[in-house]
Every structure is written in C-alpha cells, then in structure tokens.
Amino acid sequence: MTASSPSLSPTLELACELIRRPSVTPLDADCQALMMRRLEAAGFALEPMRIEEVDNFWARRGGDGPVLCFAGHTDVVPTGPLQAWQHQPFDALIDDQGMLCGRGAADMKGSLASMIVAVERFVADHPKHKGAIAFLITSDEEGPAHHGTKAVVERLAARGERLDWCIVGEPSSTSLVGDVVKNGRRGSLGAKLTIRGVQGHVAYPHLAKNPIHLAAPALAELAAEHWDDGNAFFPPTSFQVSNLNSGTGATNVIPGELTALFNFRFSTESTVEGLQKRVEAILDKHGLDWHVEWALSGLPFLTEPGELLDAVAASIRAVTGREARPSTSGGTSDGRFIATMGTQVVELGPVNATIHQVNERVLASDLELLTEIYYQTLVRLLA
C-alpha cells in the first residue's frame, strides 16, 4: 500500500506525507510547513522561529486557562546503508504485515500525524474548548539540540508564556502502544578527562610516567563507585566510560597523555555539583595530573501523578484496556527543556523497537490508537 492509497485514514495519510519528506537532521524538508497549514486551518495562531540553521514553530489556539502543549520533532536520523532497507526509507509504504515502514515512522512522524489529526477532530467537536492548545515543534532534536526546543523554551519563558501540560510524542511504548509512558528522565552529565604523564621509551620506564597505568586505578574506582540508591521513580545513578584514547601507535613509546570520555545518567538523588566533586576527589586521591571538561546535557525531571498523568493513563485505559506503566528509563529527550517551565511533561508515542534502525517501522493500526488516545486526553483536560 502506498502513501497515495485512497483507503488510508487521515492519520496514516499525513504520516506518509511527513515520512516522504527526507528531513535528516537538522533539515525540516517542509514538514513544518505542512503541519502549520493544517493547524492554521484549525484556528491556530502560528509563530515560525528559525534559529541559526534550525526550523521551529510555536502554534497556539484558545484563550486564558490551562495550556496543553504537544511537542515533537520533524528531523530524523540518517538512514544508514540504503541497500539494507527492504523498502526505500522515504517511500512510506505499508507492508503486508500492516507495518508503516520508513525513516521517522516511529521516531516521530507517526506521533506528529496522530497529534495533528487528534487536535483537528477535537477542535471540530469542541470549538469553544477550555484553555488553550499549543504545538512546539523543532527540527533539532536528533542533532546538537542547541537551537531547537531549548532555544524556543527560552523565548517563551522570557515573555511569560504559560505551559501547564505537555505531551511529547517520543516513542515511549515497548511492546504495545500505551504500555509505557515516560513521566520523567534521568539527567545526563558528560565529561572529557585528560590525564597527563611523561612520554618516554618503554625500555626506560623510570624516565617516563605512563598515564595509562596512572589512570587505571582511578577509572576502576570511578566505575565501582556507588553514587546513589535511586528512588521510587529513578534507578541508581550510573557511570560509564565511553571512550579511552592514548598512545602514539608505536609499541615502544610510553604515551604522554590519556583522554577518557565518560557519562553520568543521574537521578534526582544526585546533583551535578555533588557528582563533580566526588569525581575530582577520586582523581586527587590517586595523585593524578588531571584536567576535566564537564558538559551538562540536561537535568533530571519528574512528573508525579496529577492531572496530566491521570488523564493520559485514563485515556490509554479507555482506548486499549491497558494500564500504562510510568517510567523514567532511557535516554534524554526535549522534555528536559520543557520541564524547566514548571510544566507537567509526559512522553507518549508508538512502539520504539526499531527507532534509529534500518527498516524502521510501526504498526499502522497503532497510530490510529495513538490518535484516539491523544483525542481522549484532550477531552479529559480541555473539553
């Protein structure tokens, strides 16, 4: 079945139109123009925000009262080797198993289509709804994420924009649509560590200082350290070394320097400052000549049970009969930026089994369920 098939539902038709636009990050490939046309027709005021090379937009419909925002991204990751795909990644085909195939089908153009169609239907059914509905869309989520949601949120906060609730369309489900929702994320703190030694000949180790030998005990202690116990919402903080580089490429030269990249995924039981101090104390304990450059990608955030989480859970239950399991596992998302506005944030999207993979796909019928879940959530919060 192709994207032009007359038998496609409004959600699948729009999802296919979006997938057929090759919006490899940070490109948008006119996905947002398509979405904005639909939202403008539904009575939204539009505010495109191009920041550096990134396309973003903010759209809002309604008056005073609580604001429910739908957030997401139009950019996708690169395809990988085209010959490995069963169907071309931007053809947007539905196979004989009922799977919508294509880059972005799960992450996250399927969610975007479900959001738009759900909102169109809600506005038609409830033209005088309470509060306001908003959209915050970027083309810089899969890339550096400097000029996307983060920058838009800064502008919105500076002018006092209100955001009470936000649904981010990230693919949160694991096996069945709606089985898991993300009600928070761990923080991410990365670092580049440099250990300085003295280069020399391997036959004369007394004239050199081997930074590999010097660093090994400290790295082992960092890897074994118990950082915290986590809590009811978050697992314990984890520390992982992701890169280790040293040496000249020669077997007879003791290197003069070692660099290590490492990352913390941390819970609300730890702070950035606390983790940094503990790392630096361990490095000092081992008498190392060290330098570290820290990079904070995001702080942990948590949406506890309340209006948004209750409405989402009730909608999933009504549509699928499932009890959604709240989770804070996985990587970071743009929800970390939106949460800084004091917003209740929940991530809800399709099954994530094939995201970023060759042959990315999502069950077409799941997008219909997702559309209905979004619609029912709108009804519960704003009808």
UniProtKB/Swiss-Prot annotation:
Molecular-function annotations in GO: acetylornithine deacetylase activity; cobalt ion binding; succinyl-diaminopimelate desuccinylase activity; zinc ion binding
Reactions catalysed, as given in the entry: N-succinyl-(2S,6S)-2,6-diaminopimelate + H2O = (2S,6S)-2,6-diaminopimelate + succinate
Biological pathway: Amino-acid biosynthesis; L-lysine biosynthesis via DAP pathway; LL-2,6-diaminopimelate from (S)-tetrahydrodipicolinate (succinylase route): step 3/3
UniProt binding sites for Zn(2+) 2: D107, E142, H356
Active-site residues, record numbering mapped to chain: D75, E141 (proton acceptor)
Gene3D superfamilies: Zn peptidases (3.40.630.10)
Alphabetic keyword roster: Amino-acid biosynthesis, Cobalt, Diaminopimelate biosynthesis, Hydrolase, Lysine biosynthesis, Metal-binding, Zinc
Binding note for cofactor: Binds 2 Zn(2+) or Co(2+) ions per subunit.
Cofactor(s) demanded: Zn(2+); Co(2+)
Keyword Zinc attributed: yes
Binding site for Zn(2+) 1: H73, D107, E170
Organism superkingdom: Bacteria
GO biological process: diaminopimelate biosynthetic process; L-arginine biosynthetic process; lysine biosynthetic process via diaminopimelate
UniProt key word Metal-binding: yes
EC number: 3.5.1.18
A Pfam match: Peptidase_M20
Assembly behavior: Homodimer.
Job of this protein: Catalyzes the hydrolysis of N-succinyl-L,L-diaminopimelic acid (SDAP), forming succinate and LL-2,6-diaminopimelate (DAP), an intermediate involved in the bacterial biosynthesis of lysine and meso-diaminopimelic acid, an essential component of bacterial cell walls.
Similarity section: Belongs to the peptidase M20A family. DapE subfamily.
Protein name as catalogued: Succinyl-diaminopimelate desuccinylase
Organism annotation: Pseudomonas aeruginosa (strain UCBPP-PA14)
Gene that encodes the chain: dapE
